[in-house]
């Protein structure tokens, strides 16, 4: 909220570009000024509540059968490979902890935190499906930026569940992170069944109703950065899903 003695569009535009959401012209009435402040605070609370509900909904989508199957895998391994069982239990614990972390609902999280969740998820799935999931990564050790929570993992899960595991022989998943100009580009490529054109369009325009993973990620990226997912897919061949995170904002936050 900003105060101004000028109401011409050009001057108001300067204020809005600087981050203001509303304005009051001078001289102003105190009751009007306080009413507008209350309205803006109410809007802020409403946005936070919506984020809380949205993230709770995302977390509720963790499929019960995934939990059951993971526990069954751990139980089976415990009889033949105790060391691997311990590792898988650690991955499972890390996965659950990251998936249900409610402390950063309306914030961005370090890439390292999101990457730990992805690795835990993939370790669990590889323990279950073995060589059907072939994985390669190009993720630099020095990758340091922030992004919305639960952003990469749903894309990777889509590559596993609706990509390579749709083929009897499985397939390959490649995850890369690359800094290009002012952006960090995150890419997930798979050699799975591909996404039909109509489904791809429905995911990107938010009308797809059979699953919320990619739809939700795309919407949150648009709300945060102004650009969502880029999806290239060929049926029967595979899918490439990419998105970018501005590094400039990250570097300014560090200062």
Set out the residue ranges of the language-model regions:
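C-terminal output helix
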Residues: 10-11, 27-37
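Short, conserved "switch-loop" micro-motifs in signal-transduction and mechanochemical regulators
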Residues: 6-7, 40
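A short beta-strand-to-loop motif within the catalytic HATPase_c
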Residues: 231-235
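Alpha4-beta5-alpha5 "output face"
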Residues: 8, 13-17
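Two-component histidine phosphotransfer core
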Residues: 25, 38-62, 66-230
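Glycine-rich GHKL/ HATPase_c ATP-binding element in histidine kinases
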Residues: 171, 237-239
């Amino acid at each position: 909220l900003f105060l101004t003695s000028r109401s011409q569009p050009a001057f108001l535009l300067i204020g809005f570009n600087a981050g203001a959401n509303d304005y009051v012209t001078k001289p102003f009435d105190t009751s009007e000024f306080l009413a507008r402040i209350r309205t803006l605070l109410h809007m802020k609370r409403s946005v936070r509540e919506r984020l809380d509900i949205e993230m709770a909904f995302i977390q509720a989508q963790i499929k019960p059968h995934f939990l059951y199957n993971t526990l069954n895998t751990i139980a089976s391994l415990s009889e033949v490979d105790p060391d691997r069982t311990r590792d898988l239990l650690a991955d499972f614990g890390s996965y659950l902890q990251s998936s249900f972390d409610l402390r950063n609902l309306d914030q961005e999280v370090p890439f390292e935190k999101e990457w730990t969740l992805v690795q835990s998820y993939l370790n669990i799935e590889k323990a279950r499906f073995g060589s059907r999931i072939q994985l390669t990564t190009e993720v630099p050790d020095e990758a340091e930026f922030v992004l919305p929570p639960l952003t990469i993992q749903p894309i990777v899960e889509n590559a596993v569940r609706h990509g390579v595991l749709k083929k009897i022989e499985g397939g390959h998943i490649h995850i890369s992170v690359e800094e290009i100009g002012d952006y960090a580009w995150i890419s997930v490529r798979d050699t799975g069944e591909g996404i039909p054109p109509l489904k791809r369009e429905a995911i990107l325009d938010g009308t797809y109703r059979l699953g919320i993973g990619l739809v939700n990620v795309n919407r949150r990226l648009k709300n945060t950065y102004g650009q969502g997912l880029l999806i290239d897919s060929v049926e029967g061949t595979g899918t490439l899903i990419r998105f970018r995170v501005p590094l400039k904002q990250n570097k300014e936050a560090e200062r």
